[in-house]
Amino acid sequence: VVLVAPTSLDFDRARFAANCFRDGAAVILNCESLKPEETNRLKDFFTGCVYSLDGTMRRAAKDVFIMVPKGVGLDEDSQDESEDEA
């Protein structure tokens, strides 16, 4: 599992986490320290990564997202009801 908790918009670190995801690691993206527009940019970046690799992305909290690669399940009970906003 790779934890990404940026304090500013950092695509080098995001690229590292995306490469880990591509290689089969789950990624937790904690954007609580970012501005809303920065959160949206990172969320969009990772949404594209997850989609292109047939993974799954779920909202765990307001600005926290969990991404798992294809073939790895998520406990449905842990999903936030607002997942559609992710």
Regions found by a protein language model. Give the residues of each.
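Generic recognition of short, well-ordered alpha-helical segments
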Residues: 16, 40-41
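Short, solvent-exposed loop/turn segments at secondary-structure junctions
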Residues: 36-38
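DNA-recognition element of transcription regulators
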Residues: 44
